[in-house]
Structure formats: structure tokens, C-alpha cells
């Protein structure tokens, strides 16, 4: 009898690991696959006002320009959830962890950059997507910062990052068929000047640190070959040569 009674009160839990660099849609898919909550519920919750008590989310002041308000703040880590958990509770665990990771020391460093937390998280998310490894993160960061600072003068005001082109999707093939041919992302850094409206994924602590403390370089261009080797350039002409070396241009 005791055994039967103990089962009445047992609630099934599940551990889920979210790798670095997932976007909100991928977080939602993982939650559904693990029986935490449905993908649809998570995506609906991601744009609700339920997270406005978090300072990080409160600071987002352009939510109408974003696809998902919580993008960038769902910290990659391993979490324990209840099966069929409320989606707001589930997402809150990830946001709360992000809040903890962005401690006073890190927030003070961000303040010293003269940028907002959200701008740094946006840069970090692009670094996460565009970099081959940790060392590369700091150089990619320097290139993004150099373009943001000098772009108007030297014609590099557009960040021109492939990872932003189809956001909130990864690739054109992920865009729903009905809008695939005409889809234009508001985050496409080939089209817009400066930073996109917000983060494009949920970056790691390393990417955030790289966004805060870029290497000191005078590069404005980068590319990678299929093996992840990085090529950096100061001028458009050098970049064209690098694209050929990397097998990305004729």
C-alpha cells in the first residue's frame, strides 16, 4: 500500500540539455521532444508579457521589431523540468539562469563598453553563430565592433553576416513554403545598417565575454573554409582573395 501511495505523489521529471547557440524555435522543439511542453505553447509564451518581471526582458524596448522577445536570454545549459510543465515556468528557468550568469562583474564590464546589455547579447549571438572556435570568437568580435564604429566612413556599415539572413529560421528551406520565395528577415545584416533588432540565438558565456572584450585588430572582413579555418582581411580586395582561398569564390 505504501508503495502505491508514494506513486500517487510522484511527478515525472526530465533533464534537458540545450546546446550553445540554439534559437527560440530550436529550444521549443527540444522541449516538445522531451515532453516538457508543446512547441506551439513555448513559442506563444516566448512573446507573452509573462517575463516582464525579469530586468533583462524588461529592458527590451523594441519588441514589435523582434520575432521572439526572449531570444538571447535562454541560457544554454542542462535543466530539470516536470513533464508537461507550464511553458512560462519552463522558459523562466532558462532566463533566471541567464540572469545569474550576467552577474554584477559582467554587467559592470558591459557598462564600460558604452553599449546596452541587449546590444552586447546581440553581438554575442552573431559571434556564436559565425565563429569557428573560441580564439576566432574574439577576432570576429573585433570585426563586428570595428564595422559598428567605422562602417559609415569605410563602407562596412552593414555587418553582412550569413547567420542573420533567414532568422528566425536557419536556412531558406526552413521558411514555410508559402512565404519561402518572398521571405525577408528584419534581421538581415546585408540589408540593414548596424545591429539587427535583437539576438539571433542564445549565446554561450564565452561568446558574451568575446562581445565585451574583442581582440584589438584592424580587420573588417572574415570568412571560413569548409574545415572551419578562418581568414581575416583589412580591405575588400584582400577579402576577395580570402574568399578564393577558402573556396567560396571563383
Locations of the language-model features?
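Amphipathic N-proximal alpha-helical interface segments
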Residues: 1-11, 87-94
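Bacterial extracytoplasmic/cell-wall-associated proteins, especially those involved in peptidoglycan
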Residues: 25, 35-37, 48-250
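Conserved short alpha-helical interface segments
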Residues: 29, 40-46
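Glycine-rich loop/hinge motif
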Residues: 3, 8-36, 109-117
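Short loop/turn and capping residues at structural boundaries
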Residues: 15, 42-43, 121
Amino acid at each position: 500500500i505504501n508503495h502505491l501511495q508514494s506513486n500517487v505523489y510522484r511527478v515525472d521529471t526530465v533533464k534537458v540539455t540545450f546546446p550553445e547557440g540554439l534559437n527560440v524555435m530550436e529550444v521549443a522543439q527540444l522541449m516538445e521532444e522531451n515532453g516538457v511542453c508543446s512547441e506551439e505553447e513555448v513559442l506563444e509564451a516566448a512573446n507573452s508579457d509573462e517575463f516582464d518581471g525579469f530586468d533583462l526582458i524588461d529592458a527590451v524596448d523594441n519588441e514589435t521589431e523582434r520575432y521572439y522577445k526572449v531570444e538571447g536570454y535562454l541560457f544554454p545549459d542542462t535543466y530539470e523540468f516536470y513533464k508537461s510543465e507550464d511553458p512560462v515556468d519552463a522558459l523562466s528557468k532558462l532566463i533566471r539562469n541567464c540572469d545569474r550568469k550576467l552577474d554584477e562583474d559582467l554587467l559592470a564590464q558591459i557598462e564600460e563598453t558604452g553599449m546596452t546589455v541587449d546590444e552586447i547579447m546581440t553581438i554575442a549571438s552573431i559571434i556564436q553563430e559565425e565563429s569557428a572556435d573560441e580564439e576566432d570568437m574574439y577576432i570576429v568580435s573585433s570585426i563586428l565592433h570595428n564595422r559598428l564604429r567605422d562602417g559609415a566612413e569605410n563602407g562596412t556599415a552593414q555587418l553582412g553576416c550569413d547567420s542573420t539572413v533567414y532568422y528566425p529560421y536557419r536556412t531558406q528551406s526552413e521558411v514555410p513554403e508559402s512565404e519561402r520565395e518572398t521571405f525577408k528577415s528584419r534581421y538581415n545584416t546585408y540589408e540593414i545598417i548596424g545591429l539587427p533588432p535583437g539576438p539571433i540565438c542564445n549565446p554561450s558565456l564565452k561568446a558574451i565575454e568575446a562581445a565585451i572584450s574583442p581582440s584589438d585588430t584592424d580587420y573588417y572582413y572574415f570568412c571560413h573554409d569548409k574545415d572551419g579555418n578562418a581568414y581575416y582581411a583589412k580591405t575588400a580586395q584582400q577579402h576577395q582573395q580570402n574568399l578564393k582561398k577558402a573556396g567560396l569564390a571563383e
